Design a protein with these regions (language model features):
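Class I S-adenosyl-L-methionine-dependent methyltransferase module
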Residues: 174-182
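Core catalytic lobe of class I
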Residues: 1-158, 162-166
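Conserved SAM-binding loop
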Residues: 169-170
Length: 182
């Protein structure tokens, strides 16, 4: 997750060059304007291919501009992968690169300003990993990726440098699983 202040941790540089599995992929969320930057950065670290993702919301954060212009209701992302297509669990169904963004229910605490819905994260984890695989979230923020991975039967490791987010995620979201959150 990007930090609320707009800074983006060096995900691709730090983790991308260390991935050794046969067909790894990296899924990242970003702003539309960042897509090209992350494609180029991925290529620099061996992720030669990508699949663009669009996450369609039924709401917009730009509500104050609704009477002045068309407002955005999408978030964007990329699936970066090396030489081989990543693992792909589609159960024989066509999967489009545009996903509906369904908000979490009120029982999932909102901890981070860029927190992603658990159901969306579960869907992506189920598509690109198998039970028992490892999911890494280098910007764990709310802990939602770790929770989604655990609920899908995956092992997960998360890293968070902001102590307040770590504490809240540990207390409110991850209290029923055994996370490796640093």
């Amino acid at each position: 997750e990007n930090d609320a202040d707009g800074s983006t941790p060096p995900t691709v540089e730090k983790i991308g060059s260390k991935i050794k599995s046969k067909a790894p992929c990296m899924v990242l969320f970003c702003a539309f304007e960042q897509l090209h930057y992350y494609i180029e950065l991925g290529e620099r670290y061996g992720f030669k291919h990508y699949i663009p993702l669009v996450f369609r919301k039924n709401f917009s954060a730009q509500v104050l501009k609704a009477n002045m212009k068309i407002v955005g209701n999408c978030e964007y992302g990329l699936v970066l992968y090396k030489d081989k297509l990543p693992k792909f669990n589609n159960d024989g169904q066509m999967i489009f690169n545009c996903f509906d963004w369904v908000r979490d229910t009120k029982d999932v605490p909102k901890i981070h300003p860029t927190q992603k819905p658990i159901a969306l994260l579960e869907r992506l984890i189920e598509i690109f990993t198998d039970r028992g695989d490892v999911v890494i979230d280098p910007c764990a923020g709310s802990g939602s990726t770790l929770l989604a991975a655990a609920q899908c039967g995956r092992n997960a490791y998360g890293f968070e440098i902001k102590k307040d987010f770590y504490r809240e995620a540990t207390e409110k979201v991850l209290n029923n699983i055994q996370p490796s959150l640093f």
